[in-house]
A protein has these predicted regions:
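Active-site mouth loops of central-metabolism enzymes
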Residues: 50-64, 141-143
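A short acidic, glycine/proline-enriched capping/turn motif at secondary-structure boundaries
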Residues: 78, 87-89, 127-129
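Glycine-rich, proline-tolerant flexible connector loops at the mouths of alpha/beta enzymes
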Residues: 84-98
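Active-site region of glycoside hydrolase catalytic domains
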Residues: 1-49, 92-94, 103-470
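Catalytic domains of carbohydrate-active enzymes, especially glycoside hydrolases
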Residues: 60, 64-85, 119, 290-294
């Protein structure tokens, strides 16, 4: 195995609503995430004063970021993915003037990262938007939200033009099909046509952000971000293969629009077959031509699908309810572990788009135990990440252009799916439980030193295979 390229970016990935806390400090408004105490798959709940959402404090990154950045630098990070909390900058979402205190926080954060030699990779909207845009406009179903997002994007592009050179528009934009409130601010019972119209507005907003970035920051790069993970046919029956193709297209269509600049023919047929009419203006079509510079994605699992709907309906155990693959092991949360699938996905996306790729989320959520001596022996996490990084290296050898890898997450954080601290991802243990109890003390896990060595050796310390099939 050859060393990873010298230009390869190594780091970790976080999100504002999973780490920052300080949910109403310094003028921040209420976001949609603040109304989802049970995670991205949970429904919107009215805010009950006095009842804490674990994300209100999260891991208190808002106040403790210097300590965390120092730990990331100790591991040798060259990149850290963060998101800007939109409601920190525009509390209601439709203000003309931004909240200076919110902007100043990210000034301080980016300065701290610069001093540590860590490049920021910044997501504009990571599973949240100002709740004011949902309450007063109806979320992304309203075309007016496009303009408010563009105003927000231009504001932060201008403010951080000398601090940030890598941007992402929407986190896992294709997740809106599974969690409409999380993705586009719509009620869970919204109809399919309404969801796709809201998605269209978001795709236009993403393209406008790309256009603005290219205009204001000619040296910067801006990408999209997809929830990645291939769907395999359950059997070799042609009908299962066709079903798998259609399921993969359901999420790849977002990348097709963002990377190719127009709706693909298969989606035109899908809309016809389902009696969906997308209201699209001529200016929308022009805006969509502003395509991303690179493709970024998360990768946690793969799954199977069958043409037999009775089998599909009985699928359970993971966030997307795919049929389990009998040849793969699963995590404690039912997410199937498929390192080879990452190599296949990287080659698939490279063949499809011929644009640089960036793995901006990948990791193992697990229940860690603190030993009597205070150590955390997370060999299972090391094995998981080792095997995935080996496959990334194989994809590079295949000729795939890969910009970097940011593990999810570099430090324990509030998990997105169900708002749990017990579902731990980090190289750094944070003393906090699902009830919000704990000192928030940071402790290096065994994987901390392992990842530092991987970065130092540019991957030459990786072992070929550590996870065997069941």
């Amino acid at each position: 195995m050859k060393a990873f390229p010298e230009t390869f970016l190594w780091g970790g990935a976080t999100a504002a609503n999973q780490v920052e806390g300080a949910w109403q400090e310094d003028g921040k408004g209420i976001s949609t995430s603040d109304l989802q105490p049970h995670g991205v798959m949970g429904k919107m709940e009215p805010r009950i004063l006095g009842k804490e959402n674990i994300k209100d404090v999260a891991i208190d990154f808002y106040h403790r970021y210097p300590e965390d950045i120092a730990l990331f630098a100790e591991m040798g990070f060259t990149c850290l993915r963060i998101s800007i909390a939109w409601a920190r900058i525009f509390p209601q979402g439709d203000e003309v003037e931004p909240n200076e205190a919110g902007l100043a926080f990210y000034d301080r954060l980016f300065d701290e990262m610069a001093q540590a030699g860590i490049k920021p990779l910044v997501t504009l909207s990571h599973y949240e938007m100002p709740y004011g845009l949902v309450k007063n406009y109806g979320g992304w179903a309203n075309r007016a939200v496009i303009d408010h997002f563009e105003h927000y994007a231009r504001t932060v592009f201008t403010r951080y033009q000398h601090r940030v050179a890598l941007w992402l528009t929407f986190n896992e934009i294709n997740m809106s099909l599974h969690a409409p409130f999380t993705g586009v601010g719509l009620a869970e019972e919204s109809g399919e046509a309404e969801v796709y119209q809201a998605i269209h507005h978001q795709l236009v907003a993403s393209a406008r952000a790309v256009k603005a970035c290219h205009s204001l920051l000619p040296e910067a790069k801006i990408g999209n971000m997809l929830l990645g993970g291939l769907v395999y046919p359950l059997t070799c029956q042609p009908q299962d293969m066709l079903q798998a193709m259609e399921e993969n297209r359901r999420w790849m269509f977002f990348g097709d629009v963002q990377a190719r600049g127009q709706y693909p023919g298969y989606m035109q047929r899908f809309f016809r077959d389902h009696n969906i009419t997308i209201e699209m203006t001529e200016s929308d079509a022009e805006d969509l031509k502003h395509t991303v510079d690179f493709i970024s994605f998360s990768y946690y699992m793969t799954g199977c699908v069958s043409h037999d709907e009775s089998i599909n309906k009985n699928a359970q155990g993971n966030i997307l309810n795919m049929i389990p693959n009998p040849h793969l092991k699963s995590s404690e949360w039912g997410w199937q572990i498929d390192p080879v699938g990452l190599r296949v996905l990287l080659n698939t996306l490279w063949d499809r788009y011929q644009k640089p790729l960036f793995i901006v989320e990948n990791g193992l959520g697990a229940k860690d135990s603190v030993e009597a001596d205070g150590s955390i022996q997370d060999d299972y996490r090391i094995a998981y990440l080792n095997d995935h990084l080996v496959q990334v290296n194989e994809a590079i050898a295949d000729g795939v252009d890969i910009m970097g890898y940011t593990s999810r997450g570099p430090i324990d954080l509030v998990s997105a799916s169900h708002s749990q601290m017990s579902k731990r991802y980090g190289f750094i243990y944070v003393d906090r439980d699902d009830n919000g109890e704990g000192s928030l003390t940071r402790t290096r896990k065994k994987s901390f030193g392992w990842y530092a060595e991987v970065i130092k050796t540019r991957g030459l310390s990786l072992k070929k295979i550590t996870i065997k099939a069941p």
